[in-house]
Amino acid sequence: MTTTDPLVARMRPFGTTVFAEMSALAVRTGAVNLGQGFPDTDGPPEMLAAAAEALRTGHNQYPPGPGIPALRAAVAGHQRRFWGLEYDPDGEIVVTAGATEAVAASILALCEPGDEVICFEPYYDSYAASIALAGAVRRPVTLRPGADGRYAYDPDELRAAFGPRTRLVLLNSPHNPTGRVFTADELTTVAELCREHDVYAVTDEVYEHLVFTDAAAPHVPLATLPGMRERTLRISSAGKTFSCTGWKVGWVSGPAPLVAAVLRVKQFLTFVNAGPLQPAVAVALGLPDAYFTGFRDDIQRRRDQLAAGLADAGFGVLAPEGTYFVTADVTPLGGRDGVEFCRALPQRCGVVAVPTQVFYDDVEAGRRLIRFAFCKRPEVLAEAVTRLRRLRAN
């Protein structure tokens, strides 16, 4: 009782998330919310029907700790079907409360205090918090846009980030918030360094089915590279692929000893999750290829719609190769700071975005960049673009 702030020191840098702040702004001002990455449509009807059936037929109690067998089998089948990866559903897959818990449980399971985690910035903000909760230290490697607008890391900077306390590399591809899809050469360098330094990899691949047809490279799971399956925990979720972000159903796949470690931690975080929703996600994972390609094509059209509208409104646009998000530079509109720009945007034109600098340790690298989500209905995007054009008019 000797301090006025009861929060532990390692968590004091983390306030209310930018998503909560900007979503509250949207509600308060009636703005179009393009800040947070959630769709405004529901997922495939087969999945919704399966969830309703599960609710009606007694799937409302605790599911098994690792997840129901049907979902674990569906995850294994999905990874075999799309990526040629073989996982034993009875020991190499665990179901989690979304990818956020999967990342947190993986880091908590593998990192001792003082261990170092290499991550690529800008990064999803929960990564930094999960690393801090473990008492570990993050070592960011900055992705920078080239002349073509595509982000990339400096291989020398990545090599320099490895050291005697490096425990794991946290890799997100397709990448939030930049929309970057890591190339085979980039992944090969990551894999070589992981093997050389004998470290683990945790890969967040929730946008695995949102790689657009004009991307410079297809999505390649790091676990498919030589020597990486045995040291990689691969994470994905239903939220982004099936437009059900509120369900919070994710999974971790990997070698049995690593997955067992994650499960040991997960059981003391949420214990189990989403009993009646797990059978529905199992159904969704078995949908035909046409669902996955159609979903991608639909989201790509929305990307094109919003990117063109942002350019017309006067932003500098860094077109993404995947994900839900497009990065925009506020400099052409006279902006100097993304946080200030985003806080004023709802009043100026009735649209909400999020400042990208909050995803960086190197704040200057993202100071003039902001992120918009395009996973919204076309008419919502059209209204947002109409409002954003007021910025240029003014």
Regions found by a protein language model. Give the residues of each.
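Conserved PLP-anchoring active-site segment centered on the Schiff-base-forming lysine
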Residues: A109-I131
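Conserved core segment of the aminotransferase class I/II
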Residues: R229-Q300, G309, L391-R392
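A short helix-loop-beta submotif of the ANL/AMP-binding
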Residues: L133-R139
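N-terminal small-domain helix-loop-helix segment of the aminotransferase-like
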Residues: T2-G98, A105, E157, A284-L287, ...
